[in-house]
């Protein structure tokens, strides 16, 4: 059993960000947690990196890693991996969403 936390992983929207606005306690908390050598801070979000920075401000620099765009972009330290969807898969999803009358938001994922 772990005697102390080894990491903080949080979603943003609907968890600590509501209506596009982060709880004012979030950035100071992330900085404090990241300042400890025994804790890694990671954000998992559907947002692109620029959207993450919009709500976290300069606190984004204290993150050890991030999972952005629902897993299509992974960052850990200075390493980055991208898992783009094929265009034909995107078209299938978009077509199905429109046929079902579902709202749809697509992000190209550039930083």
Label every model-predicted segment.
Residues 2-22, 43:
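Asp-based phosphoryl-transfer active-site loop
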Residues 24-111:
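Active-site phosphate-binding/coordination module
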Residues 1-2, 35:
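Short, flexible hinge/linker loops that cap or flank conserved catalytic cores
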